């Protein structure tokens, strides 16, 4: 079985960025996705150009920070201050304009290209591209850009309209209370039994440390350090090798 451990939130803060780089060095994480509108974005771009992150995708973001498009061009996505709506408000919104989502996704993708990032896949922050208000626009944009994406049928069923490659499965259980070696092993063994020749993607959110900036930006903070410790541990790397689970990135997705 092949495993993609994708480190989400590259660009959120410098501590997150450093944690992701260390996970790459440890050899288990081979994929990450960058947020183009966060305090650590420029730092993440610099780390990429230093060769410390071999491959990178786009972490499309419409639930944190400000849009890269002018707020007046994406009014169904922002509040009165021009900030993105929070996820609870956005995902329950009935009047999200598909064209605005497409416009903003393209703006973030183009910003990544302009930064000389070789984007190799796309996913979305807080699963924005999976929830019903955004799914059609995310699918449309992904098909136009033509890059692989994270599976989009894990929350809202169906991805038949998606014309680009995805892993065979995506699992979100390595998160929060699910962050432990035993839980990760159980998840992977269940997929190895069900699809021994398949490719499964798991998200991860490592950080080298927790600081006030990270706490101000994310309700998920302390567990990021636990993830970092686990994902850089020799024990995990040896267990994966012993069970013939090959860690790959999206460049290897065929």
Predicted regions located by residue number:
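DG-centered beta-turn motif at the end of beta-strands
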Residues: 7-10
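N-terminal low-complexity, intrinsically disordered segments
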Residues: 56-61
């Amino acid at each position: 079985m092949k495993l993609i451990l994708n480190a989400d939130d590259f660009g959120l803060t410098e501590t997150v960025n450093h944690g992701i780089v260390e996970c790459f060095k440890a050899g288990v994480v081979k994929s990450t996705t960058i947020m183009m509108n966060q305090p650590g974005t420029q730092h993440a771009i610099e780390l990429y150009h230093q060769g410390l992150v071999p491959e990178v995708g786009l972490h499309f973001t419409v639930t944190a920070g400000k849009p890269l498009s002018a707020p007046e061009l994406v009014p169904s996505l922002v509040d009165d201050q021009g900030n993105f709506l929070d996820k609870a408000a956005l995902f329950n919104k009935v009047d999200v304009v598909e064209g605005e989502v497409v416009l903003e996704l393209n703006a973030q993708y183009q910003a990544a290209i302009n930064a000389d990032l070789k984007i190799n896949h796309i996913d979305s922050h807080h699963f924005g591209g999976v929830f019903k208000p955004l799914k059609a626009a995310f699918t449309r944009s992904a098909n136009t850009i033509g890059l692989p994406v994270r599976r989009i049928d894990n929350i809202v069923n169906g991805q038949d309209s998606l014309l680009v490659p995805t892993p065979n499965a995506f699992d979100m259980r390595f998160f929060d209370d699910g962050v432990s070696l035993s839980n990760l092993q159980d998840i992977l063994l269940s997929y190895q039994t069900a699809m021994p020749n398949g490719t499964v993607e798991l998200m991860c959110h490592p950080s080298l440390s927790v600081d006030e900036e990270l706490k101000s930006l994310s309700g998920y903070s302390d567990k990021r350090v636990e993830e970092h410790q686990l994902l850089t541990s020799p024990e995990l790397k040896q267990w994966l090798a012993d069970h013939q689970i090959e860690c790959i990135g999206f460049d290897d997705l065929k």
